[in-house]
Amino acid sequence: SSSGDAFSGGWADYADVATTGSPIAVTAVPTALTNDGLGVDTNTKYLPISGNGITQLWNTSSNGFDFSDLNVGDMLDIRMDISVIIASTNTVVDVNLLMGTGGSVVVPFISDQNYKATGTFEVIRYMGIYIGSTDVRDTLAQLKIEADKNCTCIVHGFYIKAIRRG
């Protein structure tokens, strides 16, 4: 017997080059994590294109996740790979995925992470989300970083797996 739901999907990995040479300045004001998609590890050949109509999941021009080719009910797994460069002890960092109009849906990737020492810290977070409305689907989603003390951030890349329902 067959189940009522069928799933298909694919993935892409967008690697950044620009922030390696010019890290993102992080302050108390939420700042978008940028990714030019020009890194040697960028790989979009496994996007679920054939018959599924998904052409991209990351928009390098707007620096945001583009879910417009997905349907309400589709699912995504996102892996964020960054390094934060902490210049002052006891720096607290947050990274949130803001989705929907005005960032009305907030998915925390890093919440109140206190870096007690200075230095460079690699941070990898993996989060599963779903497209719960047309607003979430049709509005560019962004990862935004902020900190209570000035620091910098290098984006290594974003891996995104799309799972289509139906």
Predicted regions and their residues:
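Extracellular jelly-roll beta-sandwich "head" domains, especially the C-terminal globular C1q domain
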Residues: S1-G166
